[in-house]
Amino acid sequence: MKTQFAILLIALVLFQMFSQSEAFLGGLWKAMSNLLGKRGLNELDDLDELFDGEISQADIDFLKELMS
């Protein structure tokens, strides 16, 4: 009886580990496919304007206005 109970507990633990890892790997796969898919790459192109390294005179004036 003790052996059967131990086998049942081990089976439940292994099943729980498998189901959690499957959900984690599924979420990871979905995130990677969204980033690397055609639509994901098109959306990343829109973010290039946010990382523009040039600062215009209007930007400097706005920052001075914020500082005062």
UniProtKB/Swiss-Prot annotation:
Gene Ontology BP term (one): defense response to bacterium
Main localization, broad class: secreted
Tissue expression profile of the protein: Expressed by the venom gland.
Domain of life: Eukaryota
Cellular component GO terms held in the UniProt record: extracellular region; membrane; other organism cell membrane
Propeptide: 40-68
Subcellular location: Secreted; Target cell membrane
Signal peptide: 1-23
Annotated positions for site Important for activity: W29
Keywords carried by this UniProt record: Amidation, Antibiotic, Antimicrobial, Cleavage on pair of basic residues, Membrane, Secreted, Signal, Target cell membrane, Target membrane, Transmembrane
Residues bearing the modification Leucine amide: L36
Family: Belongs to the non-disulfide-bridged peptide (NDBP) superfamily. Short antimicrobial peptide (group 4) family.
Function: Amphipathic peptide that has antibacterial activities.
Protein name as annotated: Cytotoxic linear peptide
